[in-house]
């Protein structure tokens, strides 16, 4: 159950004055950016902005005059929704739950003992009980995983642990469970190139044997209940992260963090769990239905390796090369008690970054208040971005096998440009929006959303954010 108790150490943002007058010319503020950080942002006389990512070295140029173009998709005219298809628009929809593999967990709305609204995580519901509760979000294995069950079995000697075998046997002990597993395995085999006749001729035991990854796999999907917003009348009214309520978004993150914990705990060879969200097909989504993915891998990954290299040179690099630079260049957008949001720099796509200020760098170990703080700022970033903008949400966390402390940070990247020959030939990425353009767009929209009551309480926006250098406490 998600409860409001704060079980972790407090991470209070200093209420001292932020340098709200800070602008791009950091020469006016000697000593604000740490001397170990080479200049990541340069504005040329013609208005061109050159950026370099302090962790990856990615080079980005923003040329003037292109920052006011609309960002969202150009779509055909909206089509009315068929009421008879409510909850059945795609394989992730709430009335098609038997088209996804057996659930690992779901989060449902409930009432606490004192009558207050709360959330509860239910684990491994049986096939015949899926309709007994209404999941706001549900965690299921990815039918087409990046790393298959056989990858772990053949390369690492992985076998289903006893708990997973027990859950598999219990699920298959009922006719509803067996029928569900047979049907989903058959769907996967047909999609993989088997003919319908071949699949139909397979013995049940062979179909069941192919389901091991449903109970011990390492690529999960966390699926939202809604495909369209409540009351939608046409197919342009998709339900996105930003159309959730702040409470719903918190539940979304809580179930995802719980899934991270579980993947690390159940597969010893896992070195890192990558968490991401692809929104809309131009950003890589298979369905225009809100979901996050978790992929466990047996390496820490190149992104973490680059960050760890910088971290070992400078243990405060996430302050010196990220937050402090954002403060110096007036890129801070918002903050609350345990997190800060700013316009990112040195990214291939325009990016909004949310950093946890907690000393705890792994989401599932953070207190309820710390997790909620990141959730509220990330929800605000999505709401300000809007449901028509393709985006990738990327989580970056400390791998459990790494001793060096790292902050939990989330990047929301707007997929509003297409890589072409210039980028491939030069490795210089051209963006239409500078970090200041991103800041201005998000700030303007946040003020509108706050006036409409759509944001969580406790958020300080713009000059009121009162963010100062060195506030990330991951190295405490």
Give short role names for the model-derived ranges.
Residues 2-289, 295-361, 384-396, 400-476:
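Active-site microenvironments that recognize anionic phosphate/pyrophosphate groups
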Residues 252, 370-374:
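Hydrophobic alpha-helical membrane-association signature
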Residues 364-368:
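Long, repeat-rich segments with strong aromatic
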């Amino acid at each position: 159950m998600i409860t409001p108790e704060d079980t972790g150490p407090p991470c209070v943002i200093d209420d001292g004055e932020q340098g709200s007058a800070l602008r791009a010319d950091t020469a006016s503020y000697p000593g604000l950016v740490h001397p170990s950080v080479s200049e990541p942002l340069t504005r040329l006389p013609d208005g061109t902005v050159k950026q370099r990512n302090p962790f990856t070295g990615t080079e980005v140029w923003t040329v003037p005059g292109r920052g006011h173009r609309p960002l969202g998709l150009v779509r055909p005219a909206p089509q009315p929704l068929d009421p008879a298809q409510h909850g059945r628009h795609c394989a992730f929809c709430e009335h098609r739950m038997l088209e996804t593999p057996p659930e690992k967990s779901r989060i449902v709305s409930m009432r606490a003992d004192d009558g207050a609204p709360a959330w509860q995580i239910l684990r491994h519901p049986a096939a015949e009980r899926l309709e007994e509760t209404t999941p706001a979000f549900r965690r299921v294995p990815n039918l087409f995983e990046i790393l298959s069950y056989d990858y772990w079995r053949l390369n690492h000697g992985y076998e289903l642990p006893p708990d997973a075998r027990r859950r598999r046997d219990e699920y298959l002990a009922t006719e509803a469970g067996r029928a569900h597993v047979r049907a989903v395995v058959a769907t996967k085999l047909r999609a993989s190139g088997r003919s319908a006749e071949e699949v139909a001729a397979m013995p049940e035991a062979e179909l069941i044997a192919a389901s091991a990854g449903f109970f011990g796999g390492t690529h999960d999907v966390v699926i939202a209940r809604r495909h369209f917003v409540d009351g939608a009348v046409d197919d342009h009214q998709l339900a996105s992260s930003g159309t959730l309520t702040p409470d719903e978004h918190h539940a979304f993150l809580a179930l995802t963090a719980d899934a991270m914990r579980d993947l690390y705990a159940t597969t010893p060879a896992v070195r890192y769990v990558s968490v991401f969200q692809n929104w809309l097909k131009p950003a890589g989504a298979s369905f225009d239905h809100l979901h996050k993915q978790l992929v466990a891998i047996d390496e820490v990954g190149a992104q973490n390796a680059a960050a760890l290299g910088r971290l070992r040179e400078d243990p405060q690099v996430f302050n010196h090369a990220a937050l402090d630079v954002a403060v110096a260049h007036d890129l801070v957008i918002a903050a609350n008690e345990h997190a800060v949001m700013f316009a990112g720099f040195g990214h291939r796509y325009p990016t909004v970054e949310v950093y946890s200020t907690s000393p705890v760098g792994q989401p599932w170990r953070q207190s309820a208040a710390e997790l909620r703080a990141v959730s509220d700022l990330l929800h605000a970033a999505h709401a300000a971005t809007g449901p028509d903008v393709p985006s990738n949400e990327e989580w970056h966390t400390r791998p459990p096998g790494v001793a060096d402390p790292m902050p939990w940070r989330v990047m929301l990247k707007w997929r509003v440009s297409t890589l072409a020959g210039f980028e491939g030939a030069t490795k210089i990425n051209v963006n239409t929006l500078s970090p200041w353009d991103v800041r201005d767009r998000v700030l303007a929209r946040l003020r509108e959303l706050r006036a409409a009551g759509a944001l969580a309480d406790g958020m300080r926006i713009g000059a009121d954010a009162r963010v100062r250098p060195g506030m990330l406490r991951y190295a405490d």
